[in-house]
Amino acid sequence: MVPITSLAQTLERLRRKDYSCLELVETLIARCEAAKALNALLATDWGGLRRRAKKIDRHGNAGVGLRGIPLCFKANIATGIFPTTAATPALINHLPKIPSRIAERLFSAGALPGASGNMHELSFGITSNNYATGAVRNPWNPSLIPGGSSGGVAAAVASRLMLGGIGTDTGASVRLPAALCGVVGFRPTLGRYPRDRIIPVSPTRDTAGIIAQCVADVVILDQVISGRPARILPIPLKGLRIGLPTTYFYDDLDADVAFAAETTIRLLANRGVTFVEADIPHLEDLNSGASLPIALYEFPHALKQYLDDFVGTVSFSDVIKEIRSPDVANIVNAQIDGHQISNAEYELARQSFRPRLQAAYRNYFRLYRLDAILFPTAPLAAKAIGQDSSVIHNGSMVNTFKIYVRNVDPSSNAGLPGLSLPVGLTPDRLPVGMEIDGLAGSDHRLLAIGAALEKAINFRSFPDVLN
């Protein structure tokens, strides 16, 4: 067994020949087998993984590029290795021979197909409590949700079953599970990553994203996926101007989350960060007008198109009829049967609310000369599995989906890059994450800022899933 470190550190150790690629792979396989109860992984090919590791060792180039690094791919991303099911029964036998360009770029750089990650069915939820494939469990407390919809990838990375992972994020689905599992989650500027051969929710909002142990790992994977290998230069904290839009993003926080956020802000201020407390005008109304109308309207059209292009043998009605998770079935059927979102509402959301939301962010950054904004990724920590519709938050019963996506949803709708960082643990030892967002196209600078914040915060905890 070899020590499991970050992806960046593992590459260094492989290059130094501290251990072989096969030894690394055997260690990860043993961890995956020991942590099966988390239900983080849907599909594996240990024989194939061992063969690929041995080939790398024979060639003597482990650690060059991404050679020797097993990754976890969310089950809605085509890899050419694992079934691309979106964790829904009708697609259980869907195994595209051609991988997505994201997977292809990573494999070309030497990354290994480690596993397929369990997820919320069809990406339509944030708990990863999937009635078809079973609930994914939070590695910090297996009775709690890991977040979603990329919950399996986040749980696998947090448990160090895999050295990194690729999820998808429509409104929360990379950053939220990263926050609840205590790892780093990155949603890039919309359009930075290829989107082909990924089972969609909303083309206007969907993007792949990265879940990793640290920002340095995100940078390595981002450079390969984006094809933009620009060096991330260190940024001093002193002189950074970071916005705190308190009225929306800091409202009604769980006490433990509020304490972690206040502690983080105080720490960073003491290190030289200038915080600007100012709200983004009309943000809540603009986001509400753009959010669900776009996603709900686009989903049936996007899924039908995917099935026509890449499946052929499974119809849209087949997929809908076989949905097992009640929360997903209720949402999807309401749109299909009742036309919950009309064409007029959709066009208003896409042509009016969304552009105005994007303009509100641009004006806010320009007015206050900001480098980023900072807020708690979620207003609350992980809650018990099974509370898919409603959850008690600060003494009130609230909608589970709405409360968890509240803070991460607006920047998703605006197409902005966002990076969730773990900042601490609650008294119950549950992770708390905080997100920084930047303007569209500022991904490199946002990652550099994230690396500087991460170094100052110095969160270094992982769950002990093997004991």
Curated annotation (Swiss-Prot):
It is an enzyme of class 3 (hydrolase). The keyword Hydrolase applies. Its EC number is 3.5.1.-. It comes from the Bacteria. The keyword Hydrolase applies. It holds the Pfam family Amidase. Transmembrane segments: none annotated. One of its GO terms (molecular function) is hydrolase activity. Keywords: Auxin biosynthesis, Crown gall tumor, Hydrolase, Plasmid. Gene3D superfamilies: Amidase signature (AS) domain. The active site is at residues 74, 149, 173. GO terms for biological process: auxin biosynthetic process. Pathway: Plant hormone metabolism; auxin biosynthesis. PROSITE patterns: AMIDASES (PS00571). NCBIfam families: PRK07488.1. Hydrolyzes indole-3-acetamide (IAM) into indole-3-acetic acid (IAA). Belongs to the amidase family. This is Indoleacetamide hydrolase. It comes from Agrobacterium vitis (Rhizobium vitis). The lineage of its organism: Bacteria, Pseudomonadati, Pseudomonadota, Alphaproteobacteria, Hyphomicrobiales. The gene is TA-iaaH.
